[in-house]
Design a protein with these regions (language model features):
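Mg2+-dependent endonuclease catalytic cores in nucleic-acid-processing enzymes, primarily RNase H-like
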Residues: 2-112
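Conserved catalytic/ligand-binding micro-motifs in nucleotide and anionic cofactor chemistry
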Residues: 117
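Acidic two-metal-ion nuclease catalytic site recognized across multiple nuclease folds
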Residues: 126-157
Length: 157
């Protein structure tokens, strides 16, 4: 996704349904295609599993800029800013074979958790990062925050 003169362009969407063990390699292939100058935004689920996943991405994607995005709020709340811009005509798609599946998923999204919503999540996260710069930290900032948490835990315990 990119932005030019307050218009947001969804340039390409890679959609794949694979085992969890193959998700990271699929994302790494996309990152390799995008190049080192494009940051990789990784949503961080709450709890230890989310932290472990982020660490794995940071380690495996050496050389890339990794930005973590702590997930908070419902999917509907996170999707609202993107949805508003879509409804306002400020989001454009580049033509591609992925358009129909992408639009179908966005149109069927109701926030209930039923059905597929990964493309909604990815679009919302990318939009929120570009438009608002919210809830993301670069790799160095992530590790600084983790070190600070450890210091606080040691003081308390």
């Amino acid at each position: 996704m990119s932005v030019i003169d307050k218009v947001y362009y969804v340039e390409h969407v890679d959609r794949f349904r694979v085992d969890a063990s193959k998700v990271m390699s699929g994302i790494k292939n996309i990152a390799s295609s995008d190049g080192f100058g494009i940051p990789v935004l990784v949503p961080q689920d709450p709890g230890q599993a989310g932290k472990t996943q982020v660490r794995a991405y940071v380690q495996d994607f050496a050389g890339y800029t990794i930005k973590t995005n702590p997930v908070s709020g419902s999917k509907t709340v996170r999707a609202t800013p993107f949805s508003s811009q879509v409804q306002g005509g400020n989001v454009k798609l580049l033509r591609g074979p992925w358009n129909d599946a992408y639009l179908s998923e966005l149109e069927s999204f109701d926030g209930s958790g039923a059905g597929h919503d990964d493309q909604v999540d990815a679009s919302s996260d990318a939009f929120n990062e570009l438009a608002l710069g919210i809830n993301s930290t670069g790799m160095l900032e992530y590790y600084r925050q983790e070190a600070e948490k450890l210091r606080e835990e040691r003081k308390a315990g």
